[in-house]
Swiss-Prot record:
This is Cytidylate kinase. GO terms for cellular component: cytosol. It comes from Geobacillus thermodenitrificans (strain NG80-2). The lineage of its organism: Bacteria, Bacillati, Bacillota, Bacilli, Bacillales. Its EC number is 2.7.4.25. It is an enzyme of class 2 (transferase). ATP binds at residues 11-19.
Amino acid sequence: MERRICIAIDGPAAAGKSTVAKLIANRLSYVYIDTGAMYRALTYRALQCGVDIHDEQALLSLLGDTSIELKPSPQGQLVFVNGEDVTDIIRGEAVTNAVSFVAKHPLVREEMVARQRALAEGGGVVMDGRDIGTNVLPNAEVKIFLKASVEERARRRHEENIARGFPSDLEKLKEEIAHRDRIDSERETAPLRKAPDAVEIDTTSLTVEEVAARIMEIVNERIG
């Protein structure tokens, strides 16, 4: 029987992590775990409940009362918060601009990481985020770090927003993505960085299929 491993895919906002991770998970019949969606789900709940996103204890208390479920479906992964389908709404501008502030709190990350590790027990998972290879799954058999230029990432996010029916301003997106990069890279707890043993792939001029093919080569080497 083929060994079921853990695959960690990290990188900055809009580097193509989720798209590629879903594709890899589908090809391997693995479970896809979008850790960013978990932080977005908590951020959505905080905004909904009027909880200060800079108040760590208030967020931790809210998280304790929040059920976050990731469910596969023919349309892709669905995200539920306390039974409510929030898959699309957590991709909106309000959540996008607030999520980095929520994700930088050490105690919030500690609880989220515990939940993420529990989901990965037994292997057979593809998990993407900012600190999977360095912090959440440091022993993952395959670690990938995706990067792309700010301009290309803004263009991708712009197209995603339009496809979802969200208003979108390309120049504003460039500024927001650069700002998120700074917050994610400079936070004290589990900052965005490439694991020493991760394979770095610049996706700026690559198609999703080309990136997926490269990752599958690495996975097959490790499984074999």
